Amino acid sequence: RASNPNSQTGPTIGGQVTLVISMHGRALWPAQQMKLTHWNRLADENGFIVVYPAGTDFPRKWETFDLGPDLERDVRFISELIDMLQSAYNIDPARIYANGLSNGGGMAFVLSCNLSERIAAVAMVAPAQSLPSGWCANTRPVPMITFQGDADPIVLYDGGSMGGPFNPARLVFPAVQGWVAAWAQR
């Protein structure tokens, strides 16, 4: 499920390198995420490793909408990916970051709770997440930054449900300001 990490050739801190995990949105592929983000160029210029794991099924997606075995499987996959990369490269365990677009941003959000002991910080663009308020019992704070436009037709800024092929289950997304404020207070 994971694409190959970039070939890291730049400077390191104490011989250890940073790892960035960049996750695609629903119905996208790792190669599209790589092209959208330009992380490879930045990684090669600044000496860190980036990897673009793939979600499951078709269309490709991360299971971020329901608490349950599918979500746990995706979290376990990312944890095992980190283990594999740490065994192959000298990854600094204090500098592992997750980011994503839309559904991949929702997965980064999930990792900020479920892998908070391994993830240093998360960055999300239009994160699609509809987990219930208070779903995360973990109290370790993980820094996050999120970007969301108020004209997004899929992840509605003021919350609600959009229909169509990208939301067949009619998921209801919370208002962005509300869930971000609640997350900051937890």
Where are the regions that the model predicts?
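Active-site rim elements
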Residues: 64-69, 165-171
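Phosphate/oxyanion-binding loops and surfaces in catalytic or ligand/nucleic-acid-binding neighborhoods
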Residues: 151-153, 186
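Short beta-strand/loop motif that positions the catalytic acidic residue
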Residues: 146-148
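Primarily recognizes the serine-hydrolase "nucleophile elbow" in alpha/beta-hydrolase
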Residues: 87-88, 94-142, 153
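Acidic, glycine-rich loop-and-strand cores that form catalytic or ligand-binding grooves
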Residues: 169-186
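Conserved alpha/beta-hydrolase "acid-adjacent" motif
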Residues: 153-158, 164, 172-175
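Alpha-helical structural signal in soluble globular domains
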Residues: 42, 114-118, 182, 186
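Serine-hydrolase catalytic machinery in alpha/beta-hydrolase-like enzymes
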Residues: 1-6, 10-97, 107-110, 114, ...
